[in-house]
Amino acid sequence: MVYVGAPSKSHSANNYFSHGMAFGGGGVTLSFPLTAALARTLDVCIERYPRLYGSDDRLHACITELGVPLSREYGFHQWDIRGNAHGILAAHPIAPFISIHHVEFVDPIYPGLNSLESLELFTKAMKTEPMSFLQRSVCYDKKQKLTLDISLGYVVQVYPSVLLPPELERSERTYIAFKRMSQRTEFDFDTKEIQKSMCKKPVLFFLKDVWKDGNITRGSYIRSSERDDLKRKVFCFRSPPLSDIDEIQVSASPLSKRWHLAPRRLCSAVKGYVNDTLFMFVRQCGRGAFGSAFDSLD
C-alpha cells in the first residue's frame, strides 16, 4: 500500500494539519491496494473524525488507521505562498515536476506577461518536455568567473561570481507565506535571504519561447528588461555579466525514462556566442562526470 504526495510549503499549515499529510491541492496518489482497502473502510472511518477540515485531512486520518505512512514526492507543490514565486521556481528540487496549487495568489510567473499569458507559456514549456521541466543545471565560465544557473522552462540566472551548488540549492525568499509571514522558520524547505547587493545579484534571462527540434528541446531566454548596467559599472567597478548578450538559447537532450528513479542535477556547458546570443547545451550527466564545479573549476 502506497500513499504519495507532499505537505505544504508553509510550516504553520503543516503544524496545524500534519507534516505527514499529502495536501489535496498539491495532489494525492494512492496505490490500488490502498484504494481497495479504503473503499471498504472509508465510510465508517470518516464518521470518527467529524471535526477534521477538508477531504485531505479526513483521508489522511483513515490512511493512518491503516498504518500507511506518506511517501513524500518533491514534485507535488502545495505552495501556500503569496507574491513573487521566483525563488521557488528557480530552485526546484531534483525531482520531476508534477503539480502546483494556489497560483491565483502569486504574481505572473514571467515578466511582461499577465497571469493567464504566463500560465499558458508555463504550461507550454511543461508539455514540450515534461521530464526535464524546471530541472536545474549549473555551469561556470572560469575565465570571466561567472556562474550560469539554469532552470529549464523558466529562467537562466547569470551570477557575477562563482557560487557553489550548495548555496544555489536554497530558495531565495522572494515570496511570503499564505498568512503573510516571511521569516525563515515559516517555510518547510531550505531558504535564504534575498540578495540585496546590486553587485552580487544575478542577471536574469526569462523564457520567451520553447519548441521541439527533433528530439532536442530548444528554449529562448530573453534578458530581463530591468537593466541597471550603468549603476553596476559605477558602484561595482565592473560591467554586469554578459553585458553584450540579450538572448540565451538553451538546447536540452531528452532524459532517460528511468532518470526519476535515481535523479541527479543535469550537466551543461556554454557552446559559443553569435552576435548578441549565447548558446548553451543541457544534458543528463554522463558516466564519469563529477558535476559542473569539479569539471569547470578544478
Residue ranges and their predicted role:
Residues 15-29, 92-94:
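A recurrent flexible, glycine/aromatic-enriched loop bordering the glycosyltransferase active site
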Residues 23-42:
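Conserved nucleotide-sugar donor-binding
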Residues 2-9:
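A short, conserved acidic/glycine-rich loop-to-beta-strand motif
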Residues 5, 35-40, 60-64, 101:
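Amphipathic alpha-helical interaction motifs in eukaryotic regulatory proteins
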Residues 51, 57, 62-298:
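C-terminal catalytic/acceptor-binding lobe
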Residues 1-2, 47-52, 69:
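GT-A fold catalytic core of metal-dependent nucleotide-sugar glycosyltransferases
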Residues 21-26, 47-54:
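Alpha-helix capping and helix-loop boundary segments enriched in small/acidic/polar residues
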Residues 1, 16-20, 40-43, 75-76, ...:
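Short coil/turn segments at secondary-structure boundaries
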